Amino acid sequence: MGNSLRCISQEQDPNQKKPSSVVNGNSSEKHVRRLSLIPSFRRRTLLPSLSCSGSSTSSTSKKGGIKTKKKIRERHHQEQHHHDHEKDSLIQDQTLAATNILFSQTPRNSNSAPPFRRSTSVVYTQPPTAAVAASVGSVSGALTPKKSTYGYVRSSSNRQRSSTDPVLKPNQLLDKELKVEGAETKRFVLVHGGGFGAWCWYKTITLLEKHGFQVDAVDLTGSGVSSFDTNNITSLAQYVKPLLHFFDTLKPTEKVILVGHDFGGACMSYAMEMYPSKIAKAIFISAAMLANAQSTLDLFNQQPDSNYDLMEQVHLFLYANGKKNPPTAVDFDRSLLRDFFFNQSPPKDVALASVSMRPIPFAPVVEKLHVSEKNYGSIRRFYIKTMEDDYAVPVSLQDAMIKSNPPEQVFHLKGSDHAPFFSRPQSLNRILVEISQLPPKKSS
């Protein structure tokens, strides 16, 4: 296009008088028509070169062309800057509008949290409204805990909370600092139940350590990370040996708060008889609290027949020495663990237990425990009752133990299954801290 314009300029005689627009209107129209073929976005850059080609020997024309180019660049820069400014303003307006929409959906005159939840443990603290249920549609069934074939509530992360449930609401600060003052000792020792291991206390350990306690969780022989074969355990003393070794390593004047769950109650009772001076308090959590000359098997034979069918199917006897001899261990049917032990626990904890639980040695279960009032009876005992959702150690059995061997004080933990360290870790932690702060009894 630029070459054609230069050809037009060269054909004209430089000595020829410039015709007026009236006389040579056709020539002017032809020249204008040629210029109109140039796209509008290229005219600004071509016109200065056109004027330069017409008077290439004139320095004034050259200076004028340079100034024109400079003005064009400045004008282009100003237009680009104005365009960027308008674009930034538009983005700011859109951001402000989105923010207004967000805050308009959040109640301003309430203490409730925004509708963003990291935890999925409890989404609906109350039954959902009809509008919410309609919006959920096909997944509305997830709001109601499922039931197993035995009629027991399966583990569900959105179980509706009871009005008497002591656990904090999701929009409250669950890690709010507890004041720990006046504790006789700030060291806890946790003893797991039958089939469990130190791994089951991971939530409790975290919460207690956050409040300044020193916490030790023991793996009993053949449990947790112990490589010992449970079929070869022949006595209660052999089973609790790691716990006894722990007490042997304590300083002479050091005391601990001993906590046991399930069959761990019998194990801690054995240690209480041997190390009474090193135990400040003993806490039984839905645990076997045996009387003198009583075995854990004797205790569980008192269990009502209501859960007998499920209990019989959950427990699988192992006969390492042949079926003509007594069982050597008791294993679990993994498909029934949720119904029996963890019907209120989060699914992730149920999965952890299903791959971590190990058989219970049978010999310690049938061994009768011998305790004395002088040693075992001198230690302050506390019992934490799990309520109606505990099918492994029902409330009736816990009440029978409490009646026959009364502790100093009983605490109730509602809404928990047999594993409160999974289903109600915050509530369990508060009770443990509360017991730790109870002042020591004055000697008479």
From Swiss-Prot:
Compositional bias annotation for Polar residues: 1-27
Basic residues bias: start-end ranges: 64-80
Phylogenetic placement of the source organism: Eukaryota, Viridiplantae, Streptophyta, Embryophyta, Tracheophyta
Name the record gives this protein: Putative methylesterase 15, chloroplastic
Compartment(s): Plastid, Chloroplast
Similarity-based family: Belongs to the AB hydrolase superfamily. Methylesterase family.
GO MF terms held by the record: hydrolase activity
Domain AB hydrolase-1 as annotated: residue spans: 188-312
Record keyword tRNA-binding present: no
Record's keyword terms, sorted: Chloroplast, Hydrolase, Plastid, Transit peptide
Transit peptide, from-to: 1-58
Catalytic machinery residues: 262 (acyl-ester intermediate), 390 (charge relay system), 418 (charge relay system)
Ranges of compositional bias, category Low complexity: 53-63
Cellular compartments per GO CC: chloroplast
Listed EC numbers: 3.1.1.-
Function: Putative methylesterase.
Gene (name only): MES15
InterPro entries, per database record: AB_hydrolase_1, AB_hydrolase_fold, MES/HNL
Region (Disordered): 1-36, 48-91
Protein's organism: Arabidopsis thaliana
Biased composition (Basic and acidic residues): 81-90
Keyword Hydrolase part of the UniProt annotation: yes
